[in-house]
Amino acid sequence: MSQSNYRPSVPRWVGDILELDKKRRQNQYRGSLTSGQEKKDWDEWKRRYSRKLKYARLNGWTIEEE
């Protein structure tokens, strides 16, 4: 059975954070992922869309069209 990889679509600002997170996991980035209000928004997004986050980290993601 062929298994297709689910690639969730995420807002651009989430994609930017996920890209930094990916670089951090590869030891290419050492800074903070978020700060201030963006941190609150990120924490809320992670809580709400934990399954999307899981698959985005596993299979990659696409950016939502605005």
From Swiss-Prot:
It comes from the Bacteria. This is SPbeta prophage-derived uncharacterized protein YosK.
